[in-house]
Amino acid sequence: MVLAPAVVAVLFAQSPGGLVSYEEAVRCAGLTQAASELEGAESPEGRALYDAALYWSLAAMRAGTAAGRTSQAAENDQTRARIEGVRQLSADAPAARAALRQCRERAPKLD
């Protein structure tokens, strides 16, 4: 899916907590992608996680561009964060669950 840069900028600016660092955006992208993958898209919860993952993925790509990272490097960072997120969430790590909750709270509702 390709979204116009203006749409991505609007999405990124809508974060209730304001702008975030590249590292934080990648962490949220990884956690929400991992949670979405683990939940599946069949349930309302899974769809909400998918929306949050989409938002954070776009925000991370936008933040990466602003930080001078290539799109490939930003994608690789998200992949690593997702793999780590799957490990942590599968192990029911309290810190990962808390971080996921915060990421979801900061993502705008896309429905």
Language-model features: locations:
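Secondary-structure transition/hinge residues
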Residues: M1, E37-G40, D111
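Classic N-terminal secretory signal peptides
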Residues: M1-L19
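Residue-level marker of positions within ordered structural domains that often coincide
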Residues: A6-V7, Q33-A34, P108
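Compositionally biased, low-complexity repeat tracts
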Residues: A13-Q14, V26, A81
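Short N-proximal segments of mature Sec-exported proteins
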Residues: G17-R69
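Compact alpha-helical subdomains of small soluble proteins
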Residues: L49-D111
